[in-house]
């Protein structure tokens, strides 16, 4: 075999002992086959990034679970602060290693404002060159599914048979996200993330104004992708 690129199917490639990370980079630098992996933002120590570049890393992908620190700690059990994420985004951007971001909207107990908080975090990340926006799906065996069932947001008999953009499965009372809100935010999230807080009111208006939405989306495409 003579692969041009290798994708490591590991949810958090750098969440392993430091010794293993450096041993991998030393070994891989002998071959320099471009590679791509998923990992967590707060695992990207500057020394890791330098070693990965030397080893021939092609790109990285990160999941941004939520930009709302309280929600992330209480519901998602992620203890890193927003400031820590921003610190590590700076390290990642300074490394010049290309990266993309994955976002999931519509999680249990999530509100519209929490989604906007996530968009604002993505906006501050700055250096990403790709953004995938998915819808929460309550897969069997996950804590978030159990949480949704216990809260009465989901029938325990529900089985997801589609992908991450299948129909939204949970039904939450206000003030949590409603289905029509989620549909609008899935459509406009990239705009909120790209243009930032100063454009929030205009983007919110575009959620119900298709002409304005198309104008903003065309501007976003030009600024983000350039002439393609």
Regions picked out by a protein language model, each given a short descriptive name:
Residues 3:
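Oxyanion-binding "anion nests"
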Residues 18, 22-211:
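A structural motif corresponding to the C-terminal lobe/cap of the Radical SAM core domain
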């Amino acid at each position: 075999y003579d692969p041009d690129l290798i994708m490591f199917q590991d949810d958090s490639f750098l969440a392993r002992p430091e010794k293993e990370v450096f041993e991998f980079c030393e070994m891989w630098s002998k071959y320099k086959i471009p590679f791509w992996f998923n990992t967590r933002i707060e695992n990207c120590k500057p020394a890791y990034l330098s070693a990965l570049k030397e080893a021939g890393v092609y790109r990285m992908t990160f999941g941004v679970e939520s930009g709302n620190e309280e929600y992330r700690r209480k519901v998602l059990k992620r203890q890193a602060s927003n400031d820590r994420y921003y610190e590590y985004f700076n390290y990642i951007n300074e490394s010049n290693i290309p990266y993309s971001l994955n976002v999931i909207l519509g999680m249990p107990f999530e509100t519209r404002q929490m989604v906007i908080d996530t968009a604002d975090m993505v906006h501050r990340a700055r250096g990403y060159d790709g953004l995938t926006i998915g819808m929460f799906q309550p897969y069997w065996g996950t804590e978030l599914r159990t949480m949704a069932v216990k809260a009465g947001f989901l029938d325990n008999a529900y089985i997801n048979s589609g992908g991450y953009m299948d129909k939204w499965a949970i039904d939450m009372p206000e003030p949590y996200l409603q289905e029509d809100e989620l549909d609008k935010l899935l459509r406009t999230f990239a705009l909120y993330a790209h243009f930032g807080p100063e454009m929030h009111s205009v983007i919110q208006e575009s959620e119900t104004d298709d002409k304005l939405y198309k104008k903003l989306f065309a501007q976003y495409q030009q600024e983000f992708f350039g002439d393609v």
